[in-house]
């Protein structure tokens, strides 16, 4: 990989379609897989050792590193490429057969081994988080549909089986205009918005709601991210779609001191706006379902609604501060004397966020900050597309829960490994004879990898 100094720290567009042998070897040497290999050897016991566990593990990884759609294609390349066999550790030994790798994938997907594969992913992400100060500050989450086939004897499998899922797209009136159905799993992700690096993932049956996976995802992400001195955690914002708009999720984020960027679901059928709690009919301040505050000009012949000026989130008070829009923007309002009286600053309204965490988040939905931050949610969609299309998570070539969980977890390990390689890669100045520079982050990651070796 040739990365320029002007490229992003994680230059995903620089990934090679056909990685060089140097890149493959660096990635294989980077993975902290000693515990996994020890557990696999212990599971094999005194059985036949025609193909050592380390070789099977490396061949299993090569399928995803080299982006082969099937294991047969990967084995065919190993047959005709002696240099690649040397990288995989098969200088003189025979090449495994396809059924050897199929059985290995089933063993790799067993819960005790799958936990160690997930531990490799967490260690790689923790290295990145320790070296990159802003990794995990702004996070986005989403889920994706993955097609899978279940086991013929599901009662013998300890992992969840795939089932049917359905996603409907509706209009504002609630009419279904499009529906998507699939049989398989739902892939949940938490991704850093800026760097497009996956911080946590979870695989659930397709019928599982998104909100049920958020607590586990958040806990997994907080475990791999360093905790600042204030003890509040590194994550500051979490962007999600309407699937995460429920009271339990907002309460969980409030306890973790994370600002939600979640679009609200339309649940009010009859009334477009309501009075603030504690306000009677004499008040001219109302709010809509999204939590946006408005004030009414009641002096004019026809009442006129104006959007109140948002002045910020008062963290110490736990309130959202709003001000008279006429005084803030400098225009004349017929209700100025009635609302503001002798006040120079104008009428001020403070709303306690605790009144309704869904309705009044620390970053109101009708603000430019919310709009800007919420656009970062597209990062998780790009990571989902990279996982499904670039590395083939949705190829549908796996049968059984064990194999599919091993399949997806291996893809995430490769994703985390390439993220480390991209951050560690030397940067070229752009000219053919220009010097190569190693950034501070690259040196930190290199030292961490050498210390773990």
Where are these regions (language model features)?
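Basic, short loop/linker segments at the boundary and entry of helix-turn-helix/winged-helix-like folds
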Residues: 17, 21-62, 66, 100, ...
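Long, low-complexity, polar/charged, intrinsically disordered or flexibly structured peripheral segments
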Residues: 316-362, 366
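DNA-recognition alpha helix
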Residues: 71-89
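Major-groove recognition helix of helix-turn-helix-like DNA-binding domains
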Residues: 88-107
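Basic, amphipathic alpha-helical segments enriched in Lys/Arg and hydrophobic/aromatic residues
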Residues: 372-453
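Short amphipathic alpha-helical "interface-anchor" segments enriched in bulky aromatics
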Residues: 78-79, 274-317, 354-403
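Polybasic low-complexity intrinsically disordered regions
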Residues: 101-255, 261-265
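Charged, often Cys/His-bearing segments associated with DNA-binding zinc-finger transcription factors
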Residues: 1-38, 427-453
